[in-house]
Design a protein with these regions (language model features):
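Domain-scale signature associated with acetyltransferase and cell-envelope carbohydrate enzymes
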Residues: 1-144, 150-151, 177, 186, ...
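Glycine-centered loop/turn positions within well-structured domains
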Residues: 169, 173, 177-179, 187
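Beta-rich strand-turn-strand
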Residues: 153-163, 169-172
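Amphipathic helical hotspot of TIR/SEFIR-family domains
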Residues: 147, 164
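ATP/adenylate-binding site constellation spanning eukaryotic-like Ser/Thr protein kinases
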Residues: 168, 194
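Gly/Ser/Thr-rich active-site loops/lids in small-molecule metabolic enzymes
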Residues: 190
C-alpha cells in the first residue's frame, strides 16, 4: 500500500466516524473531529461532547462534557462536566486474603501480558468495577450535577441528582443528592440547600418536565422562592408534573 495512503488512514477514519455520528444524531449533539463517541452512545438533545474527549454511554437533555475527558457513564439531564474528567475502573488485589500483588496469582485476564501464561487456574479477583456491568457502564451521574475540571471518579461510583464535585477531586464513593464534595479522596464539605429544600427539589424532579414547560418557565430557575411557591401550589392541588 502506498505510504502516503497509510499516513492518511487515521485522518480518513476520523472523518468517516465524524460523518457517521452526524448522520446518526443530527442536531442532538455538538462535537468535533477530534471527539471520539462510541457507536452505542445515546443523546437526548442539546448536548455537547468536547474536543479530544472519549465518550461511551448516554447523555440526558441539556447535558455536556468538556474537552480532554474520558467518560463512560449514564448521565442525567442538565448536567455539566468540566474538562479533564476521567475514570478509573481497574483495581488490584493488595490486601488480605491475597498474599501477592502480582496478577499471576489471581488473574486469568492478565495472561496477555505474560505470553499467555498465568499460575492461576481460575479467576480469583474482580479486576474491574462497573455501575452496570451488563451494559458496560462504569459510572452513573444524575441530573442537575456540576462536575469541575480534572475530576477523577472510581468505577462503580454514582453521583446523585444535584450534586457538585469540585475541581481536582478524586471521588471514591457515591455522592449524595445535592452534596458538595471535594478533595482527595473527595469528602462532603457542604450541601447546596437545607434538608427541606433538597427533599422538595427531589420531589419535583423538575428535569423530567417537558422541554416546552422548561422554556416557558425558565425564570423560575433564577429564584428558588418563586420555584418553591409554584410547585407547592401544584402539589397542594394534587396536580401531576407533565412528563416528557
Amino acid at each position: 500500500m502506498n505510504k502516503d495512503i497509510i499516513k492518511h488512514i487515521p485522518f480518513l477514519y476520523a472523518i468517516s466516524l465524524y460523518l457517521w455520528h452526524k448522520w446518526k444524531n443530527g442536531d442532538k449533539v455538538k462535537f468535533w473531529l477530534s471527539t471520539r463517541i462510541s457507536s452505542k452512545c445515546r443523546f437526548e438533545g442539546m448536548n455537547m461532547v468536547g474536543k479530544r474527549t472519549l465518550f461511551h454511554g448516554c447523555l440526558g437533555y441539556g447535558s455536556y462534557i468538556g474537552n480532554d475527558s474520558l467518560v463512560n457513564a449514564e448521565i442525567g439531564r442538565f448536567t455539566s462536566i468540566g474538562s479533564g474528567f476521567t475514570y478509573i475502573n481497574g483495581t488490584h488485589a493488595y490486601k488480605s486474603p491475597f498474599v501477592s500483588t502480582s496478577p499471576l496469582f489471581f488473574s486469568l485476564g492478565k495472561e496477555r501480558f505474560f505470553s499467555g501464561k498465568s499460575f492461576a487456574k481460575r479467576q480469583m479477583f474482580n479486576e474491574f468495577r462497573y455501575f452496570d456491568k451488563d451494559r458496560g457502564i462504569v459510572n452513573k451521574i444524575g441530573s442537575d450535577c456540576w462536575i469541575g475540571s480534572n475530576v477523577t471518579i472510581i468505577g462503580g461510583v454514582e453521583i446523585k441528582d444535584g450534586a457538585v464535585v469540585l475541581a481536582h477531586a478524586v471521588v471514591t464513593k457515591d455522592v449524595p443528592p445535592y452534596a458538595i464534595v471535594g478533595g482527595m479522596p473527595a469528602r462532603v464539605i457542604g450541601y447546596r440547600y437545607d434538608d427541606e429544600t433538597i427533599s422538595f427539589l427531589l420531589k419535583t424532579k423538575w428535569w423530567n418536565n417537558t422541554i416546552k414547560w422548561l422554556k416557558e418557565h425558565w425564570m423560575l430557575f433564577c429564584d428558588i422562592s418563586a420555584f418553591r411557591n409554584y410547585f407547592s401550589d401544584m402539589f397542594d392541588s394534587n396536580m401531576n408534573l407533565i412528563k416528557r
